[in-house]
């Protein structure tokens, strides 16, 4: 048996490349698209089977885009070459999304939610994201600032405003998730917001809003008159 089962060894009607050319990329499954990137399987599985195992081992596409080289290479059938192919693909997508951000203007909380809801709502730990805006409320950048249990003693305004100054932001919005799915603000959430609001006034970089993301829903502290 060949050490690496290639795409052209899969029955012609099941080959991802041929399906893409004939039907279009939108007709392929996630596993088939990844198979085209990886090109070969291994001695135990063809490339489509390997792609299926990779995607499902990391918890779907969201997990794939967050996986490190070490985590990928711990999967059966994934060595350095395939791990770097996956990481390069993910990085290209991330850069594309960043280039899209600069076209977005924020006028209401739902505009912000569109940027972060899918990313944050399914996470198992709290993550704080900073959105930097220019003088016209257009997005300059979106950055993950903190990961872990959020409380007012751990989230330091210095880390947030350092990134805002670096990007020449005129104003900022922060967002974080509640893994419980309930976006009701905690006392720590309110304390963090108050501290950042006061620091923003001193630095001339206004905190416009703080969004808390739950399970497919969100709360804006601005709309709740907490900010």
Swiss-Prot record:
GO terms for molecular function: metal ion binding; metallopeptidase activity. A motif (JAMM motif) lies at residues 176-189. Residues 105-227 form the MPN domain. InterPro entries: MPN, RadC_JAB, RuvA_2-like, UPF0758, UPF0758_CS, UPF0758_N. Gene3D superfamilies: Cytidine Deaminase, domain 2. It holds the Pfam family RadC. It comes from Clostridium perfringens (strain SM101 / Type A). Belongs to the UPF0758 family. Zn(2+) binds at residues 176, 178, 189. This is UPF0758 protein CPR_2111. One of its GO terms (biological process) is proteolysis. It comes from the Bacteria. Keywords: Hydrolase, Metal-binding, Metalloprotease, Protease, Zinc.
